[in-house]
Swiss-Prot record:
The modification N6-(pyridoxal phosphate)lysine is found at residue 101. Pathway: Amine and polyamine biosynthesis; agmatine biosynthesis; agmatine from L-arginine: step 1/1. Its EC number is 4.1.1.19. The keyword Magnesium applies. HAMAP family: SpeA (MF_01417). This is Biosynthetic arginine decarboxylase. SUPFAM superfamilies: PLP-binding barrel (SSF51419). The gene is speA.
Amino acid sequence: MNEWSIDDARAGYNVAHWSQGFYGISDEGEVTVSPDPKNPTFKIGLNALAKDMVKAGVSLPVLVRFPQILHHRVDHLCQMFNQAIQKYEYQSDYLLVYPIKVNQQQTVVEEILASQVSKTVPQLGLEAGSKPELMAVLAMAQKASSVIVCNGYKDKEYIRLALIGEKLGHSVYIVLEKMSELQMVLEESKKLGVTPRLGLRARLAFQGKGKWQASGGEKSKFGLSAAQILKVVERLKDEDMLESLQLLHFHLGSQIANIRDIRHGVGEAARFYCELRKLGAKVNCFDVGGGLAVDYDGTRSQSNNSMNYALAEYANNIVSVLTDVCNQNEQPMPRIISESGRYLTAHHAVLITDVIGTEAYSPEDIPAPEEEAPQLLHNMWRSWNEISSRLDQRALIEIFHDTQSDLAEAQSLFALGQLSLEDRAWAEQCNLAVCHELQGLMNARNRYQRPIIDELNEKLADRFFVNFSLFQSLPDAWGIDQVFPVLPLSGLDKVPERRAVMLDITCDSDGIVDQYVDGQGIETTLPVPNWSAEDPYLIGFFLVGAYQEILGDLHNLFGDTNSAVVRIDEEGQTNIESVLAGDTVADVLRYVNLDAVSFMRTYEELVNSHIAEDERAMILEELQVGLKGYTYLEDF
């Protein structure tokens, strides 16, 4: 790696493919964001932005939101469906419905709604999956189309609130997830004097592939079978309310990577739609649910972290399949609804934080073992010396295997009391030296050596201790092995001479990022430039805007991070519009029913009992500051 250019950095981190044009690397080697696609030359340096916030008193880690990205995602998705509708001469329209479960933060929901302010005909609705979410959307939906889709399991209170939504001027679709909900809707609608808008969630036979595939298929947690759907139709006929059935919904699962799965699912659901129309139901909305994926690793593949289609292809497939099936069955074309929350929100947020320290292997001179040392150590010494004399590629593999076997035996003998601590330490250092030399000699183009190279990269990787909680800020990385792009925010104009793994500050061995976007694939380590306390750089975790905040937990009582809303104006100036303080220690204690006020009283009693009078005020002040302080590290 004697020659290095910014283009190498851009390709190495695959930024152009996962960023959708929102993020990039400047010629100076700094990560930038272009939040306003209307002015792509306007860029914000994330490193400089973070330093400005720190100077203003905002401690890291900080979650930075770029609302202009939300606006663009809404507009772009609607535009692609509108173009597909025109292309296939589809005889209805498209409505984007945002499921607030993806990110319920007020700033996020309000910015998504604000994208409709200038629209003559709003093309956005909201979805709720619980009573708290329904209460929120009842107060917010009028800022867009006033369309509300109610999913999830429901009780009488949920149903009454949804029906009250109709009285408030909203168009509220109550999607039946199970048979018992129909009876409650019929009873409560009569009591309130409201004609309900009903939807059905069909349980398709087809099941898409992916981490969330259980959301679809015949064994899905939600939805009605074909027989149950017929019972609903018959019951509504008996009640003379069949016209209330207006929406068909299905869901293949989140993050569907293969466009064929989407096409197959839409085709089966379209047949349900046509059959319902033939039975006399006036269904006029076709809700494809979620599934629109985000290309987290930028590989444009069928992996769980990617997608093998573009947005236009997604819209074209849905519209074309519906057009064909409706024409074949001589049925009117319904309004198309999608609940594409992950696509809307993932890119808009970046977690920025600092490295509090590193551990790195540095080659050391290895002395020859004493003549009377165990034979095992002499074997390892021979392997070390053979590296320089046996340079054929097969010999390198043999040396690696021999050394690993010898190290395992040395550790076993130590555990049995047959090897001294000094001998074990020598064996481990010799092994590291051998691995370090082999790492430089092996060739990634040799397919037999690739697995060993990966193992060496992982074994010799620097350990970056990063000021964040994986469980709070990237829970899907821990829970379902979701990949999120990770980058140093500066120094990318330098050769990445090291490889590293990112460890969080929780007391949990699972608190490690073990997958990284690297070129056109996923690796277990990340290439990074040299890091030092004298010349540190910050770390950015990207595409964290969907699900991560609401799923994050309080492991070790690390709470919500600070967050900021940042916008770029028409002159290209950066505006930090608002900063929301993260959780204090007192906040997280309260979440687990621990009372900071009573703790303070206890501290006072202990201080009065154990601390000299001239120190009491100082000690009490530090304890009080501790309760009011940030849960993350601030002084290191």
